[in-house]
Every structure is written in structure tokens, then in C-alpha cells.
């Protein structure tokens, strides 16, 4: 569905938030937009319609979970695999959570939905299912960012919670978003929240 939209507007503010929606008008009065930067893109025509401050270094916040989902989906783990939550997986998470407990059993698919919804405990369980340590998962995120040409992005965690040294730009977020929009598997997870 997202690919069928005429255009997508990503607004980045402080604190960082991003939104996507269909744009009904053909003109954008940019002087009326108050943000830390913005990017208006037409998927159908591969056309940048308006942009501002796309190279400015910003804190990525929840957009980090797009890359977390990227690494999770590119891991060689079947979505129907049952994952048993361990105490180790729940040691360090904080923030929004679904109250997972050691011993809980979920499919990898359910964890991916929970990640897209924004649950940090699901992000930790996924990270420690894909990799041996949280640091190894973050290293994969940074490697993928470099592979995609996201030269101004550094990930420090996979939840998006504030940590010193974590940074990105609107341009890099757009690069990742375009890459993920081409992944039908990712779009299936995201579509659930459009309904």
C-alpha cells in the first residue's frame, strides 16, 4: 500500500518523530513547515518534491527500529520458529515493553510484529536471537548502514533510546526507508498498522 501512495512526507522534529501519509495537495508551502528538517518524496515518480536540512546531524530515536527490523529480517531465522525468552534477554532493556518474562514462548514473527509496534523488550529478544551479544547486533546495524551508503549514521543501540554517540541524518533515514520499502516482507509487517 505504501508504494501505491502518491507521495510520502517524513517530518523530523525534536524530539525526533517521523510520519508517513498521502499528500493530497500538489504544492507545499515550505515556509509554513516548522521542523528540524523534512523530506517530501513521490515514490511513483522517484521524485524529491521538497526537502530541508536533510544533511543535518540529528538523533534517530524510533527510526532506529527500521534498521533493527532490517537486520532481523535479513537473519536466517524462519518466522515460525518458537523463541523462548531467557532471563539474559531481559537484563538490559528499558523503555516501552510488552512485559515479556523469562520462559515466555513466541514465534519470531510475533517478535517482529512487536518490534514494529515499538516494544524494546522484543528488540532485545530479537537481537539476542540473531546474535550472541547486543554489541554484535549493533555492529551488524552499523555495517548495514555503511553498505547502504548511510555515511552520517552511527547506531549505539537497537531500541532508539537516547545514548551518546547515536546519530543520523534525514537523508540517511530516507535511504534506509527506501531500501526497506522494497522489501515486501517488511511491508507486510508494516501494513498491519495501517488498518
Model features per residue range: what roles?
Residues 1-2, 51:
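Short, Lys/Arg-rich N-terminal segment immediately upstream of the first membrane anchor
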Residues 2-24:
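Sec-dependent N-terminal signal peptides of Gram-positive bacterial secreted proteins and lipoproteins
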Residues 15-20, 42, 185-188:
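Intrinsic disorder/low-structure terminal segments
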Residues 20-171, 180-181:
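Active-site-adjacent loops and short helices of periplasmic peptidoglycan-processing enzymes
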Residues 172-195:
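Extracytoplasmic
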Amino acid at each position: 500500500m505504501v508504494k501505491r501512495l502518491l507521495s510520502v512526507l517524513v517530518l523530523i522534529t525534536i524530539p525526533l518523530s517521523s510520519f508517513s501519509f498521502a499528500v493530497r495537495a500538489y504544492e507545499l508551502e515550505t515556509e509554513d513547515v516548522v521542523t528540524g528538517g523534512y523530506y517530501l518524496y513521490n515514490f511513483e515518480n522517484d521524485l524529491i518534491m521538497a526537502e530541508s536540512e536533510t544533511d543535518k546531524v540529528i538523533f534517530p530515536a524510533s527510526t532506529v527500529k527500521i534498521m533493527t527490523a532490517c537486520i532481523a529480517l535479513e537473519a536466517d531465522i524462519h518466522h515460525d520458529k518458537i523463541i523462548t525468552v531467557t532471563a539474559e534477554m531481559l537484563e538490559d532493556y528499558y523503555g516501552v515493553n510488552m512485559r515479556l518474562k523469562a520462559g515466555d514462548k513466541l514465534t519470531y514473527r510475533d517478535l517482529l510484529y512487536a518490534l514494529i509496534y515499538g516494544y524494546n523488550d522484543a528488540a532485545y529478544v530479537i537481537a539476542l536471537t540473531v546474535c550472541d551479544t547486543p554489541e554484535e547486533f549493533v555492529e551488524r546495524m552499523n555495517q548495514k548502514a555503511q553498505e547502504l551508503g548511510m555515511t552520517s549514521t552511527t547506531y549505539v543501540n537497537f531500541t532508539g533510546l537516547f545514548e551518546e554517540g547515536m546519530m543520523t541524518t534525514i537523508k540517511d533515514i530516507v535511504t534506509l526507508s527506501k531500501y526497506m520499502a522494497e522489501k515486501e516482507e517488511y511491508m507486510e509487517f508494516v501494513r498491519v498498522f495501517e488498518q
